[in-house]
Design a protein with these regions (language model features):
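Nucleotide-sugar donor-binding/catalytic module of glycosyltransferases
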Residues: 1-128
């Protein structure tokens, strides 16, 4: 089953490589990564464009900043997967995540939505 992962981007040059690398390192090949830049003013778009060399990565550069909801909607319009996953550009997925999602879809007889947990990672060591 084909999965589209939509990554909305706005001024996240510090995190974007880790996000996209985590998707490209998945052991699941039947997916596309749709990166939608919401008119970033930092180097985010340039970082995203270097991933276009991968055949399953599509980068869309919006002409006007219009917020997260519109950026996700553009990603939906540009995607072609049977399932859509949103991954914020300052987040990343663990190895095997997409394959686990595919397994859940098959096991649970094609659910309409899947929600899964997350870990919080802090840059500062004084955060509890």
């Amino acid at each position: 089953m084909f999965i589209s992962v939509i990554v909305p981007v706005y001024n996240v040059e510090k995190y974007l490589d880790k996000c996209l690398e985590s998707l490209l390192n998945q052991h699941y090949s039947d997916m596309e990564i749709v990166v939608v830049d919401d008119k970033s003013t930092d180097g985010s778009l340039n970082i995203a464009k270097k991933y276009e060399k991968h055949t399953n990565v599509k980068v869309v550069a919006k002409e006007k900043n219009s917020g997260l909801s519109d950026t996700r909607n553009v990603g939906i319009k540009e995607s072609c997967g049977q399932y859509i996953m949103f991954l914020d550009s300052d987040d990343y997925v663990e190895n095997g995540c997409i394959a686990k999602i595919q397994g859940i879809i098959e096991k649970e007889n094609a659910p309409d939505i899947i929600y899964f947990g997350y870990y919080e990672e802090y840059e500062s060591t004084d955060k509890q």
